[in-house]
Amino acid sequence: MALKLHHTAFNPSMAVTSSGLPRSYHLRSHRVFMASSTIGITSKEIPNAKKPHMPPREAHVQKTHSMPPQKIEIFKSLEGWAEENVLVHLKPVEKCWQPQDFLPDPASEGFMDQVKELRERTKEIPDEYLVVLVGDMITEEALPTYQTMLNTLDGVRDETGASLTSWAIWTRAWTAEENRHGDLLNKYLYLTGRVDMKQIEKTIQYLIGSGMDPRSENNPYLGFIYTSFQERATFISHGNTARLAKDHGDFQLAQVCGIIAADEKRHETAYTKIVEKLFEIDPDGAVLALADMMRKKVSMPAHLMYDGKDDNLFENYSAVAQQIGVYTAKDYADILEHLVNRWKVENLMGLSGEGHKAQDFVCGLAPRIRKLGERAQSLSKPVSLVPFSWIFNKELKV
C-alpha cells in the first residue's frame, strides 16, 4: 500500500498491538484528552470457539452511521471536484504494470531455469524477512474486505455495483490496481519454495471471512482519514521490504516491493487530497474526525489475522516486522506527524471549543507516541520463541 524511509528496528522485546503501537501507548493517561463528541464505542477482538460458522476473531460493539445526514450533501457536491482531483491519480490499465512483468514466464522455454534462478536468489533470505513479506502479502490479499469497507461509507459508496459516480469509479479502480499487489507477492513467494502455501491460503481465507474493524462508523470523514494513514503505512512497509530485499541480495524482489510501494504512494496522495478538501470546507468536522480516529488508534487492516493455530498471529507478525525495521511504532508517529503537517492542522482557524481541543490533541500526539515508544524500547522483557506456520512452524524470537 517509494523507497524513502529507512528506520532503525525496535527492540525485539517491544510488544505491539493491532494499531502498530507499543503497548505502553495504551496507557490510561492517554484518555484524559478525549473531547470529541463523535468518539466511537471501543470494540474488542476475542477468539470465538462456540459457533463454527462465526469468524474465529470477532469485532464487537460497533458504532454505525455517526455522520449527520446533512453532511452527505458535502460529498454529493464534491462529485465534480473528485473527478478532476482524485480520479487523476488512477492509471489506465494499459499503462499499469502487471504481475507477470516481474515473474518467470511459464510460456517460455527457459521457465524452469528462471524459477531456479529465483530460488537461488531467495534461499538465503532470513526467515524473519519471509514472515514479514508473507504477512504483507496476506494483508494485500484481503482486498475484498477493503472494498467492502469503502462501500460502507455514507455518501460515497457504490450504490449499484457499477455506479458512475466519481466516488464509485475511484473505489472500483483503486481495488483493481491494488489487486495486482497480492497477486504478485503471492506468486513470488510460491515460487521460492520456502513458505507453506496451504497455511498461507488458510490464513487469507480466515482473514477475509473475519473482515476488519477500522471503527470508521460508515463515516467518510473517518474512512478517508483511515485510508490516508493506511496507504502511507503500506508505502513505508513495502519501501522497507524493498530496501531489505536489496540488502539480502535479491534485486528482483526489491524491484517488486518498490513498484508496489510506488502504487501505495500514489493512492496515498489521492486519499490525503480528499481529507485536505474536507479540512478546507469543514475544518471543525475534519479535525474532530481526525482526533476521534487517533484516540481510537488506527488498527492495521489485518488485525483479525488467524491461521487456525496462533491466536496472537497478528501481534507476533507485527513484532517481527518491528524487529527488522519494516513497520515500527516510530513509523506510526511519523505518519501522524506527516498528515498533521500535510493538512496544516496547526494553522486551522475559526474552530469551535471542541475543535480547538481536538486540534491541540492531534498536534501534540506524535511527540507523545515517540516518547512512549522510547520508554517501551528501554524496558527489558523476556524474549520467547514462537512458531510460524507460514514457514513450516520454524520458531522465531518475538
UniProtKB/Swiss-Prot annotation:
Q: Is Oxidoreductase among this UniProt entry's keywords?
A: yes
Catalytic EC class: oxidoreductase
Gene3D superfamilies the UniProt entry points to: Ribonucleotide Reductase, subunit A (1.10.620.20)
Transit peptide range is 1-34
Which Pfam families does UniProt cross-reference here? FA_desaturase_2
According to the record, how does the cofactor bind?
Binds 2 Fe(2+) ions per subunit.
Q: Name one GO cellular component term.
A: chloroplast stroma
Q: Which reaction is this enzyme known to catalyze?
A: octadecanoyl-[ACP] + 2 reduced [2Fe-2S]-[ferredoxin] + O2 + 2 H(+) = (9Z)-octadecenoyl-[ACP] + 2 oxidized [2Fe-2S]-[ferredoxin] + 2 H2O
The Swiss-Prot or TrEMBL record lists the needed cofactor(s) as:
Fe(2+)
Q: What is its EC number?
A: 1.14.19.2
GO BP annotations, alphabetical order: fatty acid biosynthetic process
* Record region (Disordered): 46-66
Question: Where is coiled-coil annotated?
Answer: none
**Can you tell me which residues bind Fe cation 1?**
140, 178, 181, 264
Q: In which pathway does it act?
A: Lipid metabolism; fatty acid metabolism
What's a single GO MF annotation on this record?
Answer: metal ion binding
Where Fe cation 2 is bound, by residue?
A: 178, 231, 264, 267
Q: Where does this protein reside within or beyond the cell? A: Plastid, Chloroplast; Plastid
Has UniProt tagged this entry with the keyword DNA-binding? no
The UniProt subunit note reads as follows: Homodimer.
| PANTHER family, sorted | ACYL- ACYL-CARRIER-PROTEIN DESATURASE-RELATED (PTHR31155), STEAROYL-[ACYL-CARRIER-PROTEIN] 9-DESATURASE 5, CHLOROPLASTIC (PTHR31155:SF27)
The entry sums up its family as follows:
Belongs to the fatty acid desaturase type 2 family.
**Protein purpose:** Converts stearoyl-ACP to oleoyl-ACP by introduction of a cis double bond between carbons 9 and 10 of the acyl chain.
Q: What is this protein called?
A: Stearoyl-[acyl-carrier-protein] 9-desaturase, chloroplastic
